[in-house]
Amino acid sequence: MPAPVPALLCLALALASAQPSPPPPPPFPVVATNYGKLRGVRAALPGDVLGPVTQFLGVPYAAPPTGERRFQPPEPPSSWAGVRDATRFAPVCPQHLDERALLRDCLPAWFAANLDAIAAYVQDQSEDCLYLNLYVPGGANGKKMADDVTGNDHGDDQDSRDPGVGGAAAAAARKPVMVYIHGGSYMEGTANIVDGSVLASYGDVIVVTVNYRLGVLGFLSTGDQAAKGNYGLLDQIQALRWVEENAGAFGGDPDRVTVFGSGAGASCVSLLTLSHYSEGLFQKAIIQSGTALSSWAVNYQPARYARALGERVGCATPDPGSPPGSPPGWDSASLVSCLRGKAAGELARARVTPATYHVAFGPTVDGDVIPDDPQILMEQGEFLNYDIMLGVNQGEGARFVDGLGGGHDGGYGGYGGGYGGGVEDDEVQDGGPDGAAGGVSAGEFDLAVSGFINDLYGRPEGRGDALRETVKFMYTDWADRDSPEARRKTLVALFTDHQWVAPAVATADLHARYGSPTYFYAFYHRCHGGGGGGGGVDGVAGGVAGGVGGEEARPAWADAAHGDEVPYVFGVHMAGPGDVFGCNFSRNDVMLSAVVMTYWTNFAKTGDPNQPVAQDTRFVHTRPNRFEEVAWAKYDPRGQLYLHIGLRPRVRDHYRAAKVAFWLELVPHLHGLAADPGAYLSAAATRAAPSGDPDRDPGGGGGGRRRPRPATRRPAVMTSSSMASGSGMTSSSGSGMTSSSGSSASAVLIETRRDYSTELSVTIAVGASLLFLNVLAFAALYYKKDKRRHETHRRPPPPRPPQAPPSAAAADRNPRPDPGPAGRRGGECGAVVTAMAAEASAGGLGHDGVGGVGVGGVIGGVAGLRLACPPDYALTLRRSPDDVPRAGAGPGTMTLIPGALGGGGGGAVHGFNTFGSGVGVAGVAGVATSQAGPGLPHGHSTTRV
């Protein structure tokens, strides 16, 4: 008898439960790399949406750059025996968070606003700092179910690349790798600040954050072989080599590597796409708020700042070959040797302040890592092999305006006290709409614009004033020109457009010109919540500690400032309380962060931010978000489509097109560079710092020039006279590389450019003369046409045939009443007119086709005859323009109606018609013509005669 079905089910369940379940993954997994084994730590993330992540922290990717390796390219790391602990962060690269030395305008808003919190991450500094951090997703609790390919940590610690461990399944499950380059104006910052766990778990990607050499140690250059510079960029390239070699050990795909960064990190990413050293190391790039075309992206005067550094730290070594009594030269090799002997902290603390909108120590055009000017490389298509996604934030330039206006001392950033830490205005604290009392005054506006133009374009005679006035005109809100708040808003737009938007659009145009996949975004959201912790959102931590100062004091005018997209990219809103990003995030913030992470990781997977994972944030809201209905279109130079990222997303086109065209097209022409587009600029170019003391305070005067498109282009070129001045730095090998020295010879000579003021004056004079002659000719033509019209359309009809006088009988049958004296005078006038008409007809004046007497023609035909009676005003009223018959006498006859002048009717009889709507043509062969055009003399003219 068969067993009952319930009994069989119970037996099966018992057998299944008797089998041993797989052991839970260990809390400290071990992975074998090419250089040795690493022990990481498995971290659980809050909420039901995020799965666990394995972190490998402080992993060396290069040998320590100490001793003789200082100011040298990085070398691969040495192997180690045993298992290396990778559960703690490694020391950060030397830097100095001095408020006076920070380039705050180019720092992320959250960085500058929370220096006290940032300082905690950079306390442990060492020149041995070339380490990276890995965040590897794993576990079945993640939103995107991910296989734990790091499960090679049992028993013998086998390598996951071994076919015996996972085999083809492990190879098929390899995850994309996203390598993050942190920002900080090349002088400060660390990858340890940003936690990649949430991004890795939510997007199912491996996230790598990289520390690289900063400031003097990372970017010192003498302009010759003694110190070529770009060591920080070479560190990043070495990190990418390490990822290529070892990504498989962590389950990553070395053929799907995406490099992304924000601010100075974005500029580094942009430069990496142009360097042949990084070919094959990554396939996609995400450039957030910064490109290689910005004025602060590349340093074109490295030797000048190297010399200034030597003077600061006591390494000003005279050239032994210089004759006695001559200005001391500079031996670059001796300078570098001296700097190698200095402590790293001393070099980091040395204050060498760059010119405004420039950097003292940053990437340089060395002919090797960066072989040429970035714009030239882009125009040559050096970066077309990469898929690129790039964009800007709405209010990138807010920090440039920070501190302007009454009631401020440091603005929303406070220059060291959190958002609003320095704000004293009651309206801001009370949540007023303006954010600061008084906004920006007219004087402050003029000074800000003048300083901006002077620092970037110099003070060329004549053209500088015209350029300043043009910029003021373009960035004046003429609908509210007297409003201080409007001035502040337009100033933010000015700095944003010039420093971020125009370079980004120029980069996108150059990349998409030949069809390379390009996506552009504009980020329009910032946190509006108050400081302090908060509750969770459906299993996702929704509160982040208020940090320093708190977001509640951040004024409304700040918009989405520089760096505000970073916490949304890394999912800080889901990670729980923190101390760097000071805001209590709302449900909308959590939703938008999920959206941004989906876009970023989709792009890393496929090169298309729309796939393979669809937008879905129902874990935050019960209803779908608006991004589910938006398809992010590719960018192309013609359509210029971009995604507006905010709570109301939409795909739009031509982001700030008018202002971008102003900076990329008009400003270079206004500055007089269009006549010589191939000429290299002087050392005072916009990409190069203005001449003068490199340690002057930012905002001081300086000269500068730029070439067209995108307005910050070319490196310095020195004239023979400046090379022979003997006041610059020369290498020991006699390379002849020259830098300025002293006030008398501090500036590299500017190439002589032709003055076009005389030609312009002559052109204007000739044009005015031709215009006057045209006006005279037109007036004469009009007079002749008017006279001809009167002569043609006032001609009398032919005389009527003679009629027999009425008989006396008929007269008796129809007696006429006596008209009286007036009537008799009218009759007399009629007789006179009849006689005049007959005489005119005999003179050949003809018929006017209207059927009435042409008074003008009569008077013209018998000009010598004067009427002996008063005029008949009834006739005048009948022959008013409104009563002129409109039908022609026959085919082909055209009647010109004087009443149509200035009214309706046909088109103008001349291209520069002075009438309101042209001379009206009633009709030709019975067909009415179209209405006249507008009243201006020409469609593109404002001249009235």
Curated annotation (Swiss-Prot):
Transmembrane stretches, start-end: 762-782
Topological domains annotated Cytoplasmic: 783-945
Keyword tags: Cell membrane, Disulfide bond, Membrane, Postsynaptic cell membrane, Signal, Synapse, Transmembrane, Transmembrane helix
GO CC term, one of those recorded: excitatory synapse
Biased composition (Low complexity): 713-742
Span of the signal peptide: 1-18
Protein name (record): Neuroligin 4-like
Source organism per UniProt: Mus musculus (Mouse)
